[in-house]
Amino acid sequence: MKLIFLHGLGQSAESWKEVQNLLTDYPSEAIELFSSEVNSYQKVKDRVYQHLAQETEPFVLVGLSLGAALALELSSYDLPNLQALVLSGCPLKLAGNILFYIQLLIFKLLPKRVFEKQGADKSLMVGVSEELKTLDLTAIAGSCPYPTLLICGSKDKPNLSSMKALHRLLTNSQFQIIPDGPHILNRAKPKEFAEITRSFLEFLK
């Protein structure tokens, strides 16, 4: 079974390297979501779907943050070889989410150099966040048939409640909290992330 990794906003495919190195007994691929041509959530969704539709072997989608939302949304598409989902720090509903709106406002106010220091692009971060402010995955989660592993860091307070809500909606799901884990678990807690994911993959066999 192949693992296909989807990174978060402000990250790159490289963000999954440590996790991939800890799961080398599974073939894997980390998709670079954004480029100069692919610079919106809708374009990313279309391109990743086209890529996944061409997969010829069974695969599991592993996503963090934006990548998790993308994985969950794509689970409602026609993907015959999709077997399961691993979602980390996944937002469920950003429409009407005051904290997300405040974050978007801060993004708009921060100077470009702050983003550049983090290796991020301000216009991309703001543009994609604008698209996501109407996101509501409640209906998709409620009808998702795939076995799903939900992972959240104990320090990721903004996403803990949405992950608990996802766990209630996803009838075939497991929920694991990583102690002292922040939002960016693929970077901060790769060993723990890989161990939990490995246990889930063994459970699927």
For each predicted feature, which ranges?
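Conserved alpha/beta-hydrolase "acid-adjacent" motif
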Residues: K157-M163
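Catalytic histidine-centered segment of alpha/beta-hydrolase-like enzymes
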Residues: G181-A194
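Gly/Ala-rich beta-loop-alpha elbow adjacent to hydrolase catalytic centers
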Residues: G63-A71
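Hydrophobic, aromatic-rich cap/lid helix
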Residues: R113-A139, K155
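Conserved acidic catalytic loop of the alpha/beta-hydrolase fold
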Residues: Q42-F59
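Flexible "cap/lid" loop of the alpha/beta hydrolase fold
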Residues: Y41, S76, L82-P111
